[in-house]
Amino acid sequence: MRDCCHQKSISSIIVALLSLPMSNFVAHGQQGTPAEPIDVETKMEFALRGQREAHAIKYGDWRKFCFQTPGAKTVCRTTISGKWETGQSAVRVDFIEREGEDAARLQLFLPVGLYLQAAARLTVDQGKPFRIPFVWCLTNTCIAGDRANPALIRQMETGQQLKLEVADTNLLSVSTMLPLSQFASVRKAAASRIFKQEVDE
């Protein structure tokens, strides 16, 4: 019984987070403004000391999950996760959409130990990078998120690879490449799983 209640509690938290309006997720100072492409050379407020690739990360397939709560609009998450060879979670990218709304949100779950002022940067193939600011950190993960720029969405749907760049605390640029070949088809398809949250009377 205790395990059952614990699982319901976790499910409630997940649904509650995904049910918040998109504007509630936007970082302070960026409300209502989607991530814009940046010129890294001119907009960087600090000097990176070098670069390195992230340790080997194995990515799974893109998947789509939807969350339904009575009296609220359905929220769907098209997501991909990557793990290190140890099996520990390394990266998760969520593309979040709410039924009936044009705005979408990109949310990145990343390891701790990063230089948060640098923000995360997403680049599709050889395009310009889009800046995704960090929103908050927990004990074992840091979360970056912002409204998804329509141009970035179009690039993700037609591109082949998504480059994710962050800066570590040594001011080294760290990057990893995520596959995009399945993104568009998974996003437009039916959800592979639907979570229904009942409201207690």
Where are these regions (language model features)?
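Short, low-complexity disordered leader/linker segments with a strong preference
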Residues: 4, 23-29
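Bacterial N-terminal signal peptides
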Residues: 12-23
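Intrinsically disordered, low-complexity regulatory regions of eukaryotic regulatory proteins
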Residues: 1, 22, 34-37
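Well-ordered, non-transmembrane segments within structured domains
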Residues: 2-3, 18, 129, 133
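Bacterial N-terminal signal peptides that target proteins for export
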Residues: 1-14
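A generic "folded-domain core" signal
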Residues: 28-201
